[in-house]
């Protein structure tokens, strides 16, 4: 079953809150992981692994570098769950 982008955003916000301590209300699609949310590369790996488990998708390492904003990650996960 495909998740809505809203559901994916909520799930990602919970993951980012757990990994980086960022309030879920601050996790918005336009926010940059590094610039706005202060998620470093190590934390990003944790976010990706948790997202893969939560959403049942695979995010290859070479794709992770393209996920600059929360919205990029939401779109990637939405597309990956549709094609899975």
Swiss-Prot record:
The keyword Lipid metabolism applies. The modification O-(pantetheine 4'-phosphoryl)serine is found at residue 41. GO terms for cellular component: cytosol; membrane. One of its GO terms (molecular function) is acyl carrier activity. The keyword Phosphoprotein applies. Keywords: Cytoplasm, Fatty acid biosynthesis, Fatty acid metabolism, Lipid biosynthesis, Lipid metabolism, Phosphopantetheine, Phosphoprotein. Residues 6-81 form the Carrier domain. It is found in: Cytoplasm. One of its GO terms (biological process) is lipid A biosynthetic process. Pathway: Lipid metabolism; fatty acid biosynthesis. 4'-phosphopantetheine is transferred from CoA to a specific serine of apo-ACP by AcpS. This modification is essential for activity because fatty acids are bound in thioester linkage to the sulfhydryl of the prosthetic group. Pfam families: PP-binding. Its main location: cytoplasm. Carrier of the growing fatty acid chain in fatty acid biosynthesis. Belongs to the acyl carrier protein (ACP) family. This is Acyl carrier protein.
């Amino acid at each position: 079953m495909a998740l809505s982008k809203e559901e994916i955003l909520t799930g990602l916000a919970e993951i980012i809150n757990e990994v980086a301590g960022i309030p879920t209300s601050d996790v918005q699609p336009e926010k940059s992981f590094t610039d706005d949310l202060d998620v470093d590369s190590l934390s990003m790996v944790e976010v990706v692994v948790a997202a893969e488990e939560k959403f049942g998708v695979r995010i290859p390492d070479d794709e992770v570098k393209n996920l600059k904003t929360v919205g990029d990650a939401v779109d990637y996960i939405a597309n990956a769950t549709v094609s899975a």
